[in-house]
Amino acid sequence: EXFRDVNKQDVLLFIDNILRSVQAGSEVSALLGRMPSAVGYQPTLSTEMGSLQERITSTKEGSITSIQAVYVPADDSTDPAPATTFAHPDATTVLPRGLAAKGIYPAVDPLDPTPTMLQPWIVGEEHYETAQGVKQTLQRYKEPQDIIAILGLDELSEEDRLTVARARKIERFLSQPFFVAEVFTGSPGKYVSPIETIKGFQMILSGELDSLPEQAFYLV
């Protein structure tokens, strides 16, 4: 805050990880003899988190932009600590273990984030419509997962099998060949423009690339 208010600077604040602040507050609360909540957190969790997050704001003197890592205990997003934290950021990005297990990096769930900037008047109508089409296809793929796991793809209708095939291609197309990950993936890093990315998704959604195998879309 001194950098913003006294030095009149714009500040970029990284917090790794915000749950440590919650745990510290829980320990202090226990030392003070306060009755914990049902899950064991301090009764003042919401107030403490609000006080911290409200300090990360812009003023006439400068701004503070924060990027925060949030550990989700036992992958339970309803846990009071992450649930209270998620009420404050402008946007969230979720990194599920399932995608990482498939070898898809970055393991970002396209159905879970809340991007405030993904609006047609900000990114453009074409970008917005393509993103919505991708999310709808992935959502339709997510619904019959139990049927696929138990009975296999043969029990799905022709339309559903086509949706599953395109969704799997989209999943792999969402992987990115990072320069920093060359030693792990064996694939050279490369830059891909947003225009090329949008065009690629449109071709998958329209069925132009139905003849290609899933692996052809991995790290391209």
UniProtKB/Swiss-Prot annotation:
Which reaction is the catalytic activity of this chain? ATP + H2O + 4 H(+)(in) = ADP + phosphate + 5 H(+)(out)
Please give the coiled-coil regions recorded for this protein.
none
Q: Which family does it belong to?
A: Belongs to the ATPase alpha/beta chains family.
Top-rank lineage group of the source organism: Eukaryota
- Species for this entry: Osmundastrum cinnamomeum (Cinnamon fern)
Q: How does it assemble?
A: F-type ATPases have 2 components, CF(1) - the catalytic core - and CF(0) - the membrane proton channel. CF(1) has five subunits: alpha(3), beta(3), gamma(1), delta(1), epsilon(1). CF(0) has four main subunits: a(1), b(1), b'(1) and c(9-12).
Q: Where in the cell is it found?
A: Plastid, Chloroplast thylakoid membrane
Q: What does this protein do?
A: Produces ATP from ADP in the presence of a proton gradient across the membrane. The catalytic sites are hosted primarily by the beta subunits.
Give the record's membrane topology.
Peripheral membrane protein
Q: Does the keyword Ribosomal protein apply?
A: no
Return the EC number. 7.1.2.2
What processes does the entry annotate via GO biological process terms?
proton motive force-driven mitochondrial ATP synthesis
| Record flagged with keyword Translocase | yes
- InterPro entries reported for this sequence: ATP-synt_VA_C, ATPase_alpha/beta_chains, ATPase_F1/V1/A1_a/bsu_nucl-bd, ATPase_F1/V1_b/a_C, P-loop_NTPase
Q: Please report the name of this protein according to its UniProt entry.
A: ATP synthase subunit beta, chloroplastic
Could you say which residues form the signal peptide?
A: none
Q: What GO molecular-function term can you cite, just one?
A: proton-transporting ATP synthase activity, rotational mechanism
Enzyme class comes to: translocase
Gene3D superfamilies this protein is in?
Bovine Mitochondrial F1-atpase, Atp Synthase Beta Chain, Chain D, domain 3, P-loop containing nucleotide triphosphate hydrolases
Mind telling me which Pfam families this protein's record contains?
Answer: ATP-synt_ab, ATP-synt_VA_C
Which keywords does this Swiss-Prot/TrEMBL entry list? ATP synthesis, ATP-binding, CF(1), Chloroplast, Hydrogen ion transport, Ion transport, Membrane, Nucleotide-binding, Plastid, Thylakoid, Translocase, Transport
GO CC field: chloroplast thylakoid membrane; mitochondrion; proton-transporting ATP synthase complex
